[in-house]
Every structure is written in C-alpha cells, then in structure tokens.
Amino acid sequence: MILSRVSSAIEMNVCLEEKLEKIGVSANKNPLTVCFVCTGNTCRSPMAEAVLNQLGHVPEFCTACPPELLDRRGIIACSAGIAALEGMPISQNAVAALEKNGIRVTPNNNYPAHTAHQISESDLLTCDLIVGISASHTMALMTAFPQYASKITCLAENIPDPFGGTLEDYEACLEKIRHAVGLMFYGDENA
C-alpha cells in the first residue's frame, strides 16, 4: 500500500496544493515549513534546503499553491536524514557547489554551518510538508510515520546521491535539485 502511494505520487505528480489542503495548512500560519529528507543529511537534503531558503517566498505566480497562500507568507526549509549521524557536517563539495552556483549565505540560510539531523516525530509535527529526495526516502518516511502520510510527498524526480563524488557530481546533483524544487514549489524548473 505504501509503495503504491509513493508510485502514485510520482506518476501523477501530486500538487503541493493538494498536500496543503489535506493537512489543513492555514493561510494565517507563517511561514510554510518544509523539511527535505535524504539518507545522511549531509549532501542532497541540505542542498535542497539551501535552494528553497534562497527562494524563500511564495510568489504570486506559483501554480502549485492555493490562492490564499500567494504572497502572504514565506517558506522556511529545513532538512533531516533517515539514517543521519547527528552532528556530521555538510559535505564540503555540497558547500562548494552551492557557493559556485550563487546560493547566498545569509543569517537565515547559513548552510556552511549545517550539521546532520536524524528525522524525528517532532519534525513531522512541526513541519507543514515533508519532502523525500527520492521515492525510497518517501517510502521509508511513510513506513516509519504512517500517521503523517498526508504531510509526506516526494520530489517528482529521484535525485542520485553524490556522496563521495567530485565537485562536478555535486553540481549536477544541485542542478537536478533546483529543477525539482522549482517545479514543486513554483511550477517552474528555472525558479
């Protein structure tokens, strides 16, 4: 059943709007909180977090968002891992790829200081949306936290793990993340 839910979400590219409606996100709650989840929380999910934190707002042209959310609140992203070693630093190649590709370090987006965090029930309680970086992460989340299935979704594209790869591998991964995050939150792969 869980695998079929994950497959359906990927095949039908379930809209963020539908997810928000299902979990009852209120237009009065600021900001929309999104948690990206990968395996170790040192490469893909912190890069997705940094990308969305740089975008950081719900634009008026967002095709995936309910009208009552448009330009009325920001988005704050965080990240976690399904098998994270608490406190491990972000991969230096992830930092280098983000910097090289114009993701700014700001007080609200201080990704070089990121340390790995193991996903917990409190994350699912406090975040509006939990986004698996791949179908396998989404399936693991739904298995571990079935009571929060309505908050859990997946990027439309599985993002390969660059762990241990070259800077070029991380840059290719970042490009896929930007594309997937842009499509999910802004209806535009070039957001």
What do the PLM-derived regions correspond to, one by one?
Residues 2-191:
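Short polar/charged helix/loop
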